[in-house]
């Protein structure tokens, strides 16, 4: 571009003609505008010459109020006729590219900044994407002309504009400050080469993040797996073990590869985008996305592994849709083999799904092929998505992580760590989960059914209901190298070949799973359904006066804003009244009027369903609820008493609910909550003692309701402890204790009218027992029988009586005693027989 009015007129005319057809948008504009110093000159760096790219960039700059690339710019005495340059020269008509020196504009810019110490300039790398897709050998017509890793000629670009111009995206990146580079005093030539290198690396990483790495065709990838040393060795061993020829074993490995591998197809991604845009805005009230800018910043140059929580089958589609719409490559998604069914399986596979069997046991050849396929994706930098929980959570809680995929990922990284791996937690919060009604049976204790994509079709008749909004929060990324540095500082120096299974792999993988789960919970999206569920399920009759409900919700909002759970947690906008109206509009909150006003309540079916939404945020309410529990049996407590009992119970809550704070930070967080309680009148601080309100006061009622959020969890803990203490040392195995706890919980739920089937969830008791073992409170003898530390009795009689009412403790002890007697009678009967 020059100062020539004629050239500017021609460019303006071409831009207007281009936009008769082209539609463009800017990706992640805030990420670079926040770092942009508008008082300093701006230059735009384009990867290669393209008048169409320049026209699109100029248009987006005008829309955003940014300096335009086609206008002149001054740096000291240097006046450039245009504020852009091309890093590489233009290809010829056959697409061939000639390598030359540095761009003249960049040469003059480096010289100007070097010669004038008071001057600075900003270089903004900017890319235009005409469609997004990884490069493939065969695909849809549009894919032929989408942006790829091939050098683009003029004819190809013209066709790209015609076919893909209505889906054009512009990515501005964070500015590079020339003063910082020149300030390193490396001289003109070295600074110039360093700037070029920075820009080349940047463009390569950005292209990988947006359109995907340069990967081969599926057939080539699958066949390539068979030539990898670990798979070749597995083929030899399979032939020997099964007494078959190596050719047959190789064919078997090839069939496994074809069963596993995705068939990522851009046309299917675009088709899903259209369908899902309708779905999220027609069935749901849209998607609210938070903190995605962190992913956009970390994706370039990293192998990104997305680890969402798993609440619904539509989770599979949600992330791919969101990433595509925000200019990031949709991931390869790990899906259960049960979803590889006719039509549906093909669609999912072409949308990026790769399929895995539920168990790899007894099939080392399959294990080798699957592991090698995943390793191939990782080292090529292709984003991957898998669910650390394994299956969908039917209770709304974060399930205990399944470590299989994490272990494969760790082993792959130990094998080749050149491509840094980063885990990106992803919290998905539904105001109404699509399969909610199908979960009811399992919430009532029915046997879990085998997962099937057809579960979606079972709820088609319910689509007339209002489903509310979907919230998607991206959590704090976890860089695997940094995690390993903390767990195993010398992991890089260890000799790990040939299987890459160090002794510490299992324990480290377990801790990685816990870290991922904690980061997922940190990113929780609290919605109106969650808060209404917490409030109403804490009442004895599942009902509250309309005004009382408003006060409770206002209190919860105030507390959660005063003591944020984490920077990645989001809260609903508005006040208690707006939350009530929102949930009433979803037909989950019933209303009854009388002479004194309105009563809001839950019917039996909705009460069970609402436990799901309460459990979504139980980890957020656990600590304040525990603190409130202390003041149900004690009218006053010192800070030291509160901290002592909190420290005693917190490890069990943290382990079950994946609460974020380590024990070293607990005291500080407790102080923050106590200060918030005092601020809201829930406690008074008098002479170094915290005092509860009068039992007849409104504040005490609010404190009591808050304490009940975690009450059933504490009751389950006490049940297991009471059964152990009544049974005596070395009497019960872990499995027997687990069974007794389940039966006891079922009995108590009937006696006390608890309408929460998860109260007797066997897996929760199993995890509590394991936590006692991990903490050294329990031990197993050679026969597998449990013995306990004296501190177990102190926990029962010290901390438990502070948080559980006397009548509840008495009832639990009586049922525990009766259960032990029945167990002994059954054992004696078996002995006589």
UniProtKB/Swiss-Prot annotation:
The pathway is:
Phospholipid metabolism; CDP-diacylglycerol biosynthesis; CDP-diacylglycerol from sn-glycerol 3-phosphate: step 1/3
The alphabetical list of record keywords is: Acyltransferase, Cell inner membrane, Cell membrane, Lipid biosynthesis, Lipid metabolism, Membrane, Phospholipid biosynthesis, Phospholipid metabolism, Transferase
Q: Where is this motif: HXXXXD motif?
A: 309-314
- Tell me the gene name: plsB
According to its UniProt record, the EC number is 2.3.1.15
Q: What family does the entry list?
A: Belongs to the GPAT/DAPAT family.
Q: How does the protein associate with the membrane?
A: Peripheral membrane protein
- Going by the record, the broad EC class of this enzyme is transferase
Q: Does the keyword Transferase apply?
A: yes
Indicate where this protein resides in the cell. Cell inner membrane
The UniProt comment on domains reads:
The HXXXXD motif is essential for acyltransferase activity and may constitute the binding site for the phosphate moiety of the glycerol-3-phosphate.
Return one Gene Ontology term, BP aspect: CDP-diacylglycerol biosynthetic process
Species per Swiss-Prot/TrEMBL record: Pseudomonas savastanoi pv. phaseolicola (strain 1448A / Race 6) (Pseudomonas syringae pv. phaseolicola (strain 1448A / Race 6))
Recorded protein name is: Glycerol-3-phosphate acyltransferase
InterPro entries, alphabetically? GPAT/DHAPAT, GPAT/DHAPAT_C, GPAT/DHAPAT_LPLAT, GPAT_PlsB, Plipid/glycerol_acylTrfase
Q: Which domain of life is it from?
A: Bacteria
